[in-house]
A protein has these predicted regions:
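C-terminal alpha-helical cap of glycosyltransferases
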Residues: 356-373
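Active-site-proximal region of nucleotide-activated glycan assembly enzymes
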Residues: 34, 42, 53, 116-179
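Glycosyltransferases and closely related glycan-assembly transferases
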Residues: 87-100, 107-123, 136, 140
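Conserved donor-binding/catalytic loop of nucleotide-activated donor transferases
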Residues: 118, 266-268, 282-294, 313
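Conserved nucleotide-sugar phosphate-binding/catalytic loop shared by glycosyltransferases and other
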Residues: 3-10, 27-78, 83, 230, ...
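Acidic donor-binding loop of glycosyltransferase active sites
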Residues: 97-99, 262-281, 288
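Donor-nucleotide binding loops and adjacent catalytic segments primarily
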Residues: 46, 178-183, 187-271, 304-308, ...
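A short, well-ordered alpha-helix in the C-terminal region of glycosyltransferases
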Residues: 342-356
């Protein structure tokens, strides 16, 4: 079997493609893979690191700002759209895939559209509750649209053919154990709060969570693990300004990055984070109560819609960034952590919404489209 995967721009589009490829490889080791990505995107590093062959096209989105620069950018985008379609057709004809899989991002547009026009079987995977513009445009042209959550269906053309598969979740997350994780981290029976804003860090989350962490550093009521990110190196100084001495607070674990997220999340009683699709899938799989602070700086405000899918299921609480203050976050955290019954209800509802067999479902869809079932 020959499989071509197209997706990129952010890790949220690349990691699902890598997870899908990894599972297919596990099931059919003789499968040949080719990834197509955008030159300069994160996929340029992540895909070769995972051991897959890769080819590139150049594509960009339209600049929506009415300015001279925006006009110049849009002229370039039109040219790139034409050349990327030509390049995509050439790559597909040379590789001769049995199926093309798109996981979102601008790059998947010309590749999946070209494949469909050439008569190649095509499927796309949408990670978010509110779909990206590329996947919305492709939905009518592909053989199957795979959705992470049922809520996404209402935002697509009704004529598309859907399958709810969930998002691929790493096996480390699925097998993580709370007691083992807490023992590994050396935490006691006090509540554990886990907070993070992504690898680069989120200034608003760092500022918002500082009061909660500083108070725990002073009165010891919670154990707190927080990652401030690449651009948050000022965070320890902010805690110091608030009267928290990190070197004396053994209940605080303040880091730049979290490299053992499976352990930290398994140990947590409450998670405070953004609402990226893959992170939420991990929260659901582990049944973790969460306070979600969606990033407003994402396409189609999709993180808000991701968060609301969990909020509406009674599995999480939400604070929009414009409303975020240290006091409000402390109030919500205290309200949840002081109410074991409420915490258990959130956890139960999170698990109810989880799809832990996403890889198997996706593989089943692929086999069905290829007529291998």
């Amino acid at each position: 079997m020959r499989v071509l995967l197209a997706g990129g721009g952010t890790a949220g589009h690349i990691n699902p493609a890598l997870a899908i490829a990894g599972f297919i490889k596990q099931k059919k080791p003789d499968t040949e893979f080719l990834f197509v990505g955008n030159k300069g995107g994160m996929e340029e590093t992540l895909v070769p690191q995972a051991g897959y062959n890769m080819k590139f096209i150049v594509i960009s989105g339209f600049n929506r700002k009415l300015s001279p620069k925006g006009l110049v950018d849009n002229v370039k985008t039109v040219k790139r759209t034409i050349t990327s379609s030509i390049d995509a057709k050439k790559i597909i004809k040379e590789f001769k895939p049995d199926i093309c899989i798109g996981t979102g991002g601008y790059v998947s547009g010309p590749v999946i559209r070209a494949a469909a026009k050439l008569g190649v079987k095509t499927v796309i995977h949408e990670q978010n509750a509110y779909p990206g513009i590329t996947n919305k445009m492709l939905a009518k042209e592909v053989d199957k649209v795979m959705l992470a959550v049922p809520d996404a269906k209402k935002h697509f053309d009704k004529k598309a053919d859907f399958a709810v598969t969930g998002n691929p979740v790493r096996s480390k997350i699925l097998t993580a154990n709370r007691e083992e994780a807490r023992a590994k981290l050396g935490v006691d029976e006090r509540p554990v709060v886990l907070s993070f804003g992504g690898s680069l860090g989120a200034r608003k989350i760092n500022e918002g969570v500082a009061d909660l962490i500083a108070r725990s550093g002073i009165d010891g009521r919670y154990q707190h693990i927080h990652a401030y990110g690449k651009y948050g190196k000022w965070f320890p100084d902010l805690l110091k300004e608030k009267g928290c001495e990190l070197e004396k607070a053994d209940n605080l674990d303040i880091r730049e990055f979290i490299n053992d997220m499976d352990v930290c999340m398994a140990a947590a009683d409450l998670v405070i984070c953004r609402a990226g699709a893959i992170t939420l899938s991990e929260i659901q799989a582990l049944g973790k109560p969460a306070i979600l602070i969606p990033s407003p700086n994402v396409a189609e405000n999709h993180q808000y819609h991701n968060a609301m899918a969990l909020v509406n299921a009674g599995a999480a609480d939400i604070i929009e960034e414009k409303d975020l203050t240290g006091r409000l976050l402390m109030q919500k955290a205290d309200n949840m952590l002081s109410n074991p019954e409420k915490l258990a209800e959130y956890a139960k509802n999170a698990r109810k919404t989880a799809i832990t067999d996403a890889n198997e479902r996706i593989y089943s869809v692929i086999k069905g489209v290829l007529g291998l079932v």
